[in-house]
């Protein structure tokens, strides 16, 4: 039986405000956005209510400059699962985005999520594009990655220097910022900025060549016992040097003393070499999932 809900949509002052307002309905995955306080976006919620009871919640951010809305949390209470509340929330947010002249909506989700089949069904009904795989996410024990003999990789390739990410100078950081403004490929890779709250400084590193930052590995502390590696990047011209393995090895070795039990990291689906390396060496893998992206182009001239 379908549950008819009243959908309320509105802008919110901040993501922390949303988390405080709906502490049991915002999914844990939004935590990485809490560490990005300088994001030039607006936050919006779509809330499903029946009388005074909150049945479901979608949280999204808007980038009006790019005409984009990205959903970062979508939750329906278990009692209303399969009763149409999730689709009502999504349809309501689509109409609101059209009214705001937003041209594209986007969402990323893992195939290991219990909600994945339901979400996929709703996307088809709402006319969203077929999901595209982005990265494979792996969860392994910290001891597993520490005990892989990284010591033999610690001899640094000639001309390279590994530094703590927090040691990136203001001049180096300004160069990265400038490149980020003008290089679309670089924008996709450079996900974390120096000085950003929440970066796990003990294992986040930069790679320098002649004082130029040419690579980095960035991690965030999700829980006291869990670290997630969000970004690993080395300039294409430097990869043949073995710098990628060097960065990973240095970071994993520094997990000692952090009280971290497990780590999560991700590998792009097209990176066959790294995928083979991970699946061959990182055993046992505690869990694995594929992160997919789906989107919908909105007709901004109409609703419905």
State each model region's role.
Residues 1-40, 49, 149-188:
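Short amphipathic alpha-helix that is part of the acyltransferase structural core
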Residues 29-46, 50, 55-68, 74, ...:
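A conserved beta-strand-loop-helix scaffold within acyl/acetyltransferase catalytic domains
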Residues 75-78, 111, 233-236, 267:
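Structured beta->alpha junctions
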Residues 76, 82-99, 234, 240-253, ...:
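Conserved acetyl-CoA-binding loop-helix of GNAT-fold acetyltransferases
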Residues 87, 99-103, 111-134, 269-288:
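Conserved active-site alpha-helix within GNAT-family acetyltransferase domains
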Residues 97-112, 255-267:
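Conserved GNAT acetyl-CoA-binding A-motif
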Residues 135-168, 284-304:
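C-terminal "cap" of GNAT-fold acetyltransferases
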Residues 239-304:
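C-terminal structured domain segments across diverse proteins
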């Amino acid at each position: 039986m379908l549950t008819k809900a009243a959908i309320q949509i509105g802008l919110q002052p901040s993501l922390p405000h949303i988390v405080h307002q709906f502490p049991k309905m915002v999914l844990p995955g939004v935590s990485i956005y809490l560490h990005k306080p300088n994001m030039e976006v607006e936050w919006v919620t779509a809330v499903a209510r029946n009388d005074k009871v909150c049945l479901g919640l979608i949280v999204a951010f808007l980038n009006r400059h790019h005409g984009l809305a990205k959903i970062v949390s979508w939750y329906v209470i278990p009692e209303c699962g399969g009763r149409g509340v999730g689709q009502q929330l999504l349809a309501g947010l689509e109409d609101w985005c059209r009214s705001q002249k937003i041209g594209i909506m986007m969402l990323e989700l893992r195939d290991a999520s219990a909600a994945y089949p339901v979400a996929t069904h709703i996307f088809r009904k709402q006319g969203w594009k077929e999901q595209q795989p982005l990265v494979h996410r792996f969860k392994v024990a910290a001891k597993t990655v520490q005990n892989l003999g990284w010591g033999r990789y610690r001899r640094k390739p000639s001309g390279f220097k590994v530094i703590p990410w927090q040691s990136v100078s203001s001049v180096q950081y300004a160069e990265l910022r400038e490149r980020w403004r003008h290089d679309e490929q670089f924008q996709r890779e450079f996900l974390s900025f120096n000085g950003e709250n929440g970066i796990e400084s003990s294992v986040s590193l930069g790679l320098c060549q002649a004082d130029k930052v040419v690579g980095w590995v960035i991690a965030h502390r999700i829980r006291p016992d869990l670290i997630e590696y969000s970004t690993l990047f080395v300039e294409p011209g430097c990869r043949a040097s073995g710098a990628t393995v060097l960065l990973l090895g240095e970071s994993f070795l520094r997990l000692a003393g952090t009280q971290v039990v497990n780590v999560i990291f991700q590998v792009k689906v097209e990176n066959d070499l790294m995928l083979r390396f991970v699946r061959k060496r990182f055993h046992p893998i505690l869990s694995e999932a594929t992160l997919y992206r789906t989107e919908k182009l909105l007709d901004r001239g109409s609703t419905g």
